[in-house]
């Protein structure tokens, strides 16, 4: 199977998101890379489901709470930007202060 660099990046991000999801299900608090991966994954899946950029920007702030991540992580993540493919092309989705 031949994958482009972009496809490899998406696959790696999705895998990291799955790891984060499993750790969260076990009751573990997520670290910085896990939190970013989970939020990014949720945004990419939402785009795939046909949600709009505005919906994703709003929903991106509800993926995680401060209680679900390690101390200091919410302050470290100022914004998360994910390039997603929509029916009308590729767009950049930005979520500012994603963990409240």
Swiss-Prot record:
Checking InterPro entries in the record gives: Urease_gamma, Urease_gamma/gamma-beta_su, Urease_gamma_sf, Urease_subunit
Report the coiled-coil segments: none
Q: Name one Pfam family in it.
A: Urease_gamma
Q: What is its main location?
A: cytoplasm
Its induction note reads: By urea.
Q: Name one GO biological process term.
A: urea catabolic process
| Keyword line | Cytoplasm, Hydrolase, Virulence
As its record notes, the protein acts as a catalyst of: urea + 2 H2O + H(+) = hydrogencarbonate + 2 NH4(+)
If you read the UniProt record, what top EC class would you report for this enzyme, in one word?
Answer: hydrolase
Q: Which domain of life is it from?
A: Bacteria
Which SUPFAM superfamilies does the record associate with it?
A: Urease, gamma-subunit (SSF54111)
Give a GO molecular function annotation for the protein: nickel cation binding
Q: Where in the cell is the protein located?
A: Cytoplasm
> Which pathway does the UniProt entry assign to this protein?
Nitrogen metabolism; urea degradation; CO(2) and NH(3) from urea (urease route): step 1/1
> What are the EC numbers?
3.5.1.5
Q: Which GO terms describe its cellular component?
A: cytoplasm
**Which family, according to the similarity comment?**
Belongs to the urease gamma subunit family.
Its assembly, as annotated, is: Probable heterotrimer of UreA (gamma), UreB (beta) and UreC (alpha) subunits. Three heterotrimers associate to form the active enzyme. The trimeric urease interacts with an accessory complex composed of UreD, UreF and UreG, which is required for the assembly of the nickel containing metallocenter of UreC. The UreE protein may also play a direct role in nickel transfer to the urease apoprotein.
Tell me which HAMAP family the record gives: Urease_gamma
- Name under which the protein is recorded: Urease subunit gamma
Q: Which organism is it from?
A: Proteus mirabilis (strain HI4320)
